[in-house]
């Protein structure tokens, strides 16, 4: 399932709804009907969704629960739930559940048998706990992040006996540390794990194969098209040891190989020679893996078909 903010009536910002798409392979997606529409509390801003395996909220075992920000005269956090696999949602009669702030990311913290919410404030990420998704208790804060927080655990170098927690925000800055269900204690960072058009990326919890999969918002205008902006290709996150210490890596999911149609390899070439080779490759899309040596003091910009 993929839920996303959008305006179904025009290609300009405003009138935010939650759209819904589903996929069996993360490559091919089917758009379904919108699931959240504006109401008296405001338009539908960002949030997250969980599966309530233990029926903690009382809406049924395995109910799908959306936790979202309503943007009215003030920002509030709200709940909606689905008992038909996300096809339709009912908004909780007790909304709002929390006052100001926005962008709630919620997940189940098994060691303490409770829900955790990471919520953006004007200059920090606030951590809340709940037993039932409806009543939340403030626990701590992490300063220095802006919008759309994420918080999750990853093994270092694939070692399940050595795990660290990662906290990041919309722009891709992150810290590595420890988390006890209520307090995040940073050990390393802040670092930056991506550049380009990605913003406000979210990850999936409890994937069947244990991967930490991420989908981001691509801030790319498309003049003349019947849409504005896009969702980016899914990526897998991992923690790896480098010469500078443990860092967060972001790579396209392995399923991308199913989309490949032709392969080209070249090496030991200058930038000018690579450009000449690329002229003979006629395709609208290219998946490139490059190892580039850059002289000190210089930078590298990559263009394909006139686009950076």
Stretches found by the model and what they are:
Residues 10-13, 27-61, 86-108, 119, ...:
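Surface loop/turn signatures of beta-propeller and other carbohydrate-active proteins
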Residues 23, 82-83, 127-130, 177-178:
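Conserved Ser/Thr-centered positions that define the repeating blades of beta-propeller domains
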Residues 122-131, 138:
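Surface-exposed extracellular loop regions of Gram-negative outer-membrane beta-barrel proteins
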Residues 1-2, 55-67, 112-116, 159-166, ...:
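Entry beta-strands of beta-propeller and related beta-repeat scaffolds
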Residues 4-7, 68-72, 118-121, 169-170:
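Beta-strand C-termini and the immediately following turn/loop, strongest in propeller blades
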Residues 180-196, 205-308:
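Beta-rich accessory regions
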């Amino acid at each position: 399932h993929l839920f996303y903010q959008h305006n179904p009536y025009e290609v300009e910002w405003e009138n935010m709804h939650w759209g819904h798409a589903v996929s069996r392979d993360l490559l091919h997606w089917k758009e379904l009907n919108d699931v959240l529409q504006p109401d008296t509390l405001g338009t539908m801003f960002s949030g997250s969704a969980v599966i309530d395996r233990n029926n903690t909220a009382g809406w049924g075992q395995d109910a799908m629960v959306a936790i979202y920000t309503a943007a009215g005269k003030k920002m509030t956090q709200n709940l909606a739930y689905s008992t038909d696999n996300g096809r339709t949602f009912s908004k909780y009669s007790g909304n709002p559940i929390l006052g100001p702030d926005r962008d709630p990311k919620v997940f189940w913290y098994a060691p303490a048998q409770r829900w955790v919410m990471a919520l953006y404030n004007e200059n920090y990420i606030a951590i809340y706990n709940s037993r039932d998704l409806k009543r939340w208790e403030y626990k701590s804060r992490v300063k220095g992040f802006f919008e759309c927080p994420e918080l999750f655990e990853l093994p270092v170098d694939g070692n399940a006996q050595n795990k660290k927690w990662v906290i990041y925000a919309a722009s891709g800055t992150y810290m590595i540390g420890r988390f006890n269900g209520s307090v995040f204690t940073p050990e390393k960072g802040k670092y930056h794990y991506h550049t380009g058009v990605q913003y406000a990326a979210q990850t999936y919890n409890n994937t069947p194969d244990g991967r930490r999969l991420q989908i981001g918002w691509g801030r790319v205008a498309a003049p003349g098209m019947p849409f504005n902006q896009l969702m980016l290709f899914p990526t897998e996150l991992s923690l790896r040891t480098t010469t500078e210490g443990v860092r967060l890596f972001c790579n396209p999911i392995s399923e991308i190989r199913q989309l490949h149609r032709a392969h080209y390899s070249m090496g030991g070439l200058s930038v000018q020679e690579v450009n000449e080779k690329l002229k003979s490759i006629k395709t609208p899309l290219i998946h490139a893996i490059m190892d580039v040596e850059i002289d000190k003091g210089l930078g590298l910009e990559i263009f394909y078909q006139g686009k950076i």
